[in-house]
Amino acid sequence: SSAASDVYKRQMVDNESIALPHYGLSHADVVYEMMNSTLNGRITRFMALFKDYESVDQIGSIRSVRPTNVILAAEWNAIICHDGGPFYVDEYLDEACSDHFSGTFSRVDNGKSREYTEYILSGDMDKNFSSSDVSKDYTSYYEGAHYQFANENNPVDLGTSYPDDAIDANMVDLPFPHNGSYLEYNADDQLYYYSEYGKAHVDPGNDNAQLCFKNLLIQSCGYTQYDEHGYMIFDCISSGYGYYVTNGKALYVSWKKTSMTSPTRYYDAQGNEITINTGKTYVALVPVDDWEDLVIE
C-alpha cells in the first residue's frame, strides 16, 4: 500500500456568507463546488480534497455531508471529514468503500453561532485515526490514478491541441445564484482566481491568499430532489457534458462515471481521455437546468 501521506482527506466546508472566511482551502489539491440544497438560492457547499493535510493548521468550518459528496469521495478513496448529515447519506456511508470521521474535530470561538465553529486543527486527524480502525493507506477500493497529468515541461495548450474547438476563457461565471461564484484568468501566472459574494475568496490561514486554480472542470449534471426540504442527490454515476478550462482556453468535453469507486473521466470530441495541467483543480457540478446560464468568455 502507499504511504500514509498519499491518502486523500476530504473536508465538507460551509459556503454560507456567514461562514466566511474559510480556512485552509488554498492548500487543497482539489476543490469541488456544488448545489447543497434546492432551497436558499441553490446554495453551494465546498468539498476540499487534501493530500498533505498534516501541514495545514486549520481547515473549515466543517459542516454536514450529502450523498453526492460520499459518492465522489469514493472515487478518490478519500476519508470524508464532516459533521453529520441527513438520513439520506446513511446508505452511502454504510458502503464498504466509505470511510469517514464525523463531528470529532475542534471548536474555535469565532464569535459565530455553533454550527459555524467546527474546524479541523493540527492533531485532530491523528486523534481520529488512533481512536478508529480507519486506515491511513489506500484500501482495496482504490482504482488508481484519477487524472492524466501533462508533463510540466510540456503543458496542455488547448488552443494548439484543439485549434478548431477551443474557445477563449478569461472569465468563468457559474450559475450559482446564492453566492455568485466566478473565476478570472490571470495571464501572468496562468491561474484562475476565485471570487464569490462579489469579492475575492481569501484564506486567512495562508496570508489571505486568494483561492486559485490551474484547472477548471465544469460538469453539467442531473439531480433528484428527495423532499420539500431541498435535500437532493446529483446523478453523478452517469454521463454528460461540460468544459475543461486551463491557461485562458476552454474545451467542450464529455464526462463519464460508471460506479461509486470509479473516477469521473473526461473526454474530447474524438473520445480520447483529456490530459490536464499539473496544479490545483476546481470541479463544479452545475445543475442541468441551470447549465444555459453558465458564462465562459
Region spans (language model):
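A surface/extracellular/periplasmic glyco- and lipid-processing/surface-interacting theme
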Residues: S2-Y32, L39-E297
